[in-house]
């Protein structure tokens, strides 16, 4: 069996670490650096360059150099075409992983076969699966996909002994942002809550500088540098260097000779000075976007700021003074821990987790969570949640649903992720059909839907017809990644529209209840028409028709009133039956049983896709 490593597959840089004598060691790459740029280039001579060598030639090979691919992983519609061949984000990421694997093997002098790879805590299922696929493409057996803040807390917490403590991990990397609250003690690392933004990171700070430079140059020379790919790449590199310089200096000089030429073919130079104050001004909106996830984590974990004992900064972007100051402000003046390397701590935690899984590290338990709620669409477009956000994983949950129509042969299971009450406002992860349901009146078949989230955070959904034993399963991996707006809006919209969502859900539940009551009442009358007078039957039918008519409109109170009248007439009918001959009493009891519901069946109905669309119209 080969060795196992921990890998932090980052947006801008990646790190590999290994356990040696029970201690995690960060492995330097073939160039001697402890971090490897997540950049892949296809040279014109056919050679594939990875890491620093790829980054070094980016200016002269712009169209064939790929960086920040992590922002696209899990998005099936994204690819890059080189020499008439299309490469997915998984394939490009695999190139970086292959270099890390080779460098680790060179250092260890033996094969590396297994790896724990980290991902942002807010990565969805398709992004996690795509990361796992990238590992497999690189020739690695991926032991586990671990959330980056959790890995960081694992690395930090194990050094602190058995004392119980509450840790806040603020992780701002090159392309993603996460904030997590964890409890550590007695070898247990438990995530209480997590939140974040998959499209916020150091790249955005770089882009803000690029935009500032482009505007300055355009005002001075009347030329838009964004039209020149080579010039734009030089601007990006200069912006990154200026950002890093401003972490330790009050100003940075940006000097790019021969950046372009004017209309007369005369060379033009770019020479600007960016102060730290100006840099913080043009990036303030990016900094502000970290506040809501921070507040959401405290709220979800039900933890007061004063209860946080340690603050751990992760990701190179946390070196920016404005970020450090903001974290200090948000945590009530608490000084962030300086004892961990923000670039390396995630890979160290991943190596420790690899050791746990291989039995090399004892008495450590890692309890992670799922970042967003998961559920299915039920009748009326309602989002019926089976697993709430911040549930500890791995986890499994089952609910029993039923059909919406008589003799319904199949059900369409649509799986959603998000916090809104109505399914259409959440993210559709995937769908599948369960067919072969035996003909039966609606409400009779029992369809058991099971959500199973594994330790990697990857979702498996199974639907099973309890009557026939037939089942179907889907592993959620076919959806595209959640965009920044989608993720940011999910929690935000859920709060902003909470009352509206609640009202719509209640209205739909009233409609569902009314339809079900009318159906059951008419069925009951049909089964017992020889026991009640025609006059009573007519009154019940008139009341049922009134409910039908009310359901055609939008007035929920009218539906409720019609339901009350139908209930009153139904009670009169029941009274008449019970006052009939004693010989009919047993049959009346049976009829009552026929109208009752299985207490284990959820009062929601799975509908066919077509029917679902009709409900939404």
Swiss-Prot record:
Record's note on what induces expression: By stress conditions e.g. heat shock.
Residues covered by region (Disordered): 496-515, 567-617
Keywords, alphabetical: ATP-binding, Chaperone, Nucleotide-binding, Phosphoprotein, Stress response
Family matches, as NCBIfam families: PRK00290.1, prok_dnaK
Family, per entry: Belongs to the heat shock protein 70 family.
Described purpose of this protein according to its UniProt entry: Acts as a chaperone.
Listed PANTHER family: HEAT SHOCK PROTEIN 70KDA
Protein's name in the database: Chaperone protein DnaK
Phylogenetic lineage: Bacteria, Bacillati, Actinomycetota, Actinomycetes, Mycobacteriales
């Amino acid at each position: 069996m080969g060795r196992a490593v921990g890998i932090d597959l980052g947006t801008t840089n990646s790190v590999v670490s290994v356990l040696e004598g029970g201690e995690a060691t960060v492995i330097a790459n073939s160039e001697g650096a402890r971090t490897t740029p997540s950049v892949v280039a296809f040279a014109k001579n056919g050679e594939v360059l990875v890491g620093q060598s790829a980054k070094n030639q980016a200016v002269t090979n712009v169209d064939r150099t790929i960086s920040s691919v992590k922002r696209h992983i899990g998005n099936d519609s994204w690819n890059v075409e080189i020499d008439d061949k299309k490469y997915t984000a998984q394939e490009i990421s695999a190139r970086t992983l292959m270099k890390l694997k080779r460098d680790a093997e060179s250092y260890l002098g033996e094969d590396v076969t297994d790896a724990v790879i980290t991902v942002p805590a807010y990565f969805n299922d398709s992004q996690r699966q795509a990361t796992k696929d990238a590992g497999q493409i690189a020739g690695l057996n991926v032991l586990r996909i671990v959330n980056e803040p959790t890995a960081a807390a694992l690395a930090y917490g194990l050094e602190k002994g058995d004392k119980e403590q509450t840790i806040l991990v603020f992780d701002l990397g090159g392309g993603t942002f996460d904030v997590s609250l964890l409890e550590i003690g007695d070898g247990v690392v438990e995530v209480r809550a997590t939140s974040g933004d998959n499209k916020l990171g150091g790249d955005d700070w770089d882009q803000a500088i690029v935009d500032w430079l482009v505007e300055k140059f355009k005002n001075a020379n009347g030329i838009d540098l964004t039209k020149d790919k080579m010039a734009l790449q030089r601007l990006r590199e200069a912006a990154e260097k200026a950002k890093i310089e401003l972490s330790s200096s009050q100003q940075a000089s940006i000097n790019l000779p021969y950046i372009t030429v004017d209309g007369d073919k005369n060379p033009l130079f770019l020479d600007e000075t960016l102060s730290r104050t100006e840099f913080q001004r043009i990036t303030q909106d990016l900094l502000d976007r970290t506040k809501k996830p921070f507040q959401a984590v405290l709220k979800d974990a039900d933890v007061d700021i004063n209860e946080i004992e340690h603050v751990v900064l992760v990701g190179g972007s946390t070196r920016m003074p404005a970020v450090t100051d903001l974290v200090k402000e948000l945590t009530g003046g608490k000084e962030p821990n300086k004892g961990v390397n923000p670039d390396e701590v995630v890979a160290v935690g991943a190596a420790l987790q690899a050791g746990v899984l291989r039995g090399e590290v004892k008495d450590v338990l890692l309890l992670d969570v799922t970042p967003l709620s998961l559920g299915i669409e039920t009748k009326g477009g309602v989002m019926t949640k089976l697993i709430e956000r911040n549930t500890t994983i791995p986890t499994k949950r089952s609910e029993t649903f039923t059909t919406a129509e008589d003799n319904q042969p199949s059900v369409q299971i649509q799986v959603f992720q998000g916090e809104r009450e109505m399914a259409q406002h959440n993210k559709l992860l995937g769908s599948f059909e369960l067919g072969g349901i035996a003909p039966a009146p609606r409400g009779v078949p029992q369809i058991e839907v099971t959500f199973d989230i594994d330790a990697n955070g990857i979702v498996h959904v199974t639907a099973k017809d309890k009557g026939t034993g037939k089942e179907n399963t889907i592993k959620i991996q076919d959806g595209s990644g959640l965009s920044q707006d989608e993720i940011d809006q999910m929690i935000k919209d859920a709060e902003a529209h909470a009352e509206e969502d609640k009202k719509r859900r209640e209205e739909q539940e009233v409609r569902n209840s009314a339809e079900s009551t009318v159906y059951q009442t008419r069925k009951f009358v049909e089964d017992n028409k020889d026991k009640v007078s025609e006059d009573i039957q007519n009154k019940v039918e008139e009341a049922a028709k009134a409910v039908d008519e009310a359901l055609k409109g939008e007035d929920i109170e009218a539906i409720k009133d019609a339901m009350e009248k139908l209930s009153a007439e139904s009670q009169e009918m029941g009274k008449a039956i019970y006052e009939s001959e004693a010989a009919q009493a047993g049959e009346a009891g049976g009829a009552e049983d026929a109208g009752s519901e299985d207490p284990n069946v959820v009062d929601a109905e799975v509908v066919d896709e077509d029917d679902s669309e009709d409900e939404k119209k």
